[in-house]
Swiss-Prot record:
It comes from Bacillus cereus (strain ATCC 14579 / DSM 31 / CCUG 7414 / JCM 2152 / NBRC 15305 / NCIMB 9373 / NCTC 2599 / NRRL B-3711). NCBIfam families: PRK05416.1 (NF003828). InterPro entries: P-loop_NTPase, RapZ-like, RapZ-like_N, RapZ_C. This is Nucleotide-binding protein BC_5156. Pfam families: PapZ_C, RapZ-like_N. ATP binds at residues 14-21. PANTHER family: RNASE ADAPTER PROTEIN RAPZ.
Length: 293
């Protein structure tokens, strides 16, 4: 196998119920050769098959289930072996979700958690989260699926791994509301609750930062201009260094109280500022939650 025949490999793991099945289906749609529930001890043998495939397996997605500590011993050794093979471009995609979301999903599907087959789902979730702490730390892409519908998870994966963008350094800029929690997949979090809040202007209350009247209001203040100047300078300085260190994506989260007005406005602004230089994806996690600030 030569470097001209590089193989792209994505190892998909994470919390049970966080969306591994949807993720594998998404990779299959992207033309990846997919294998689910591959025992880690078989990974070295699978790598040999990839090397002998003569280019027929140049994009591979593996769903790996880690429910016993003995599995990790095999996995760490296999990952170390991967790092020595220059013809494989590996990614570890870790799917996560809030405990409350996972419990709800188990109740909706009436399934038992694999680590608590006769007990409460939350006990199994807690045990699995402890087991996967090191795995999550080793992953180079972490996706929080708590607020994602299956279609939205597919869109995220396509954005991250489609042929046009998978080699690029990606910047995800998202708005959120602190009242709904900080995004667990955020690398950088900025709090803009110090800015004037259009929520308290009655006719702007039902609007969002996507509406011109709201964005114009937020952007007209001197403190907003000063903050954006400092923020863009900081981000512009940091991004090349993150890229140099081998990070494949950066998630920047901007939060206000409810994720409706201020954070949405500034997220849109930052996304437009970065798009000329980077592959940028802008999203608004809580913009549909019209429950007030």
């Amino acid at each position: 196998m030569t470097e001209n025949n590089d193989i792209k490999m994505v190892i998909i793991t994470g919390m049970s119920g966080a969306g591994k099945t949807v993720a594998l289906q998404s990779f299959e749609d992207l033309g990846y050769f997919c294998v689910d529930n591959l025992p880690p001890m078989l990974l070295p043998k699978f790598i040999e098959l990839m090397a002998d495939s003569k280019g027929k397996m140049n994009k591979v997605a593996l769903g790996i289930d880690l429910r016993g500590r003995e599995f990790f011993e095999h996995l760490w050794g296999a990952l170390d072996d991967l790092s020595e093979r220059t013809w494989i471009i590996p990614h570890i995609l870790f799917l996560d979700a809030k405990d409350s979301t996972l419990v709800t999903r188990y109740k909706e599907t009436r399934r038992s958690h694999p680590l608590a087959p006769t007990g409460l789902p939350l006990k199994g979730i807690e045990a699995e989260r402890n087991l996967l702490t090191d795995m999550k730390a080793r992953a180079n892409i972490v996706l929080d699926t708590s607020d994602l519908k299956p279609k939205e998870l597919r869109e995220k994966i396509v954005h991250l791994f489609s042929t046009e963008t998978e080699q690029a350094f990606r910047v995800n800029v998202m708005s959120f509301g602190f009242k709904y929690g900080i995004p667990i997949d955020a690398d950088l979090v900025f709090d803009v609750r110090f800015l004037p809040n259009p929520y308290y202007i009655p006719h702007m209350k039902p609007l969002t930062g996507l509406d011109e009247e709201v964005s114009s209001y937020v952007l007209k203040f001197n403190e907003t201009h000063k903050f954006l100047e400092k923020l863009t300078d900081l981000i512009t300085f940091m991004l090349p260094h993150y890229k140099r260190e081998g990070k494949s994506q950066l998630v920047i989260a901007i939060g206000c109280t409810g994720g409706q007005h201020r954070s949405v406005t500034l997220t849109e602004y930052l996304g437009k500022h970065l798009k000329p230089e980077y592959s940028v994806h802008v999203s608004h996690r809580d913009v549909e939650k019209r429950k007030g600030h």
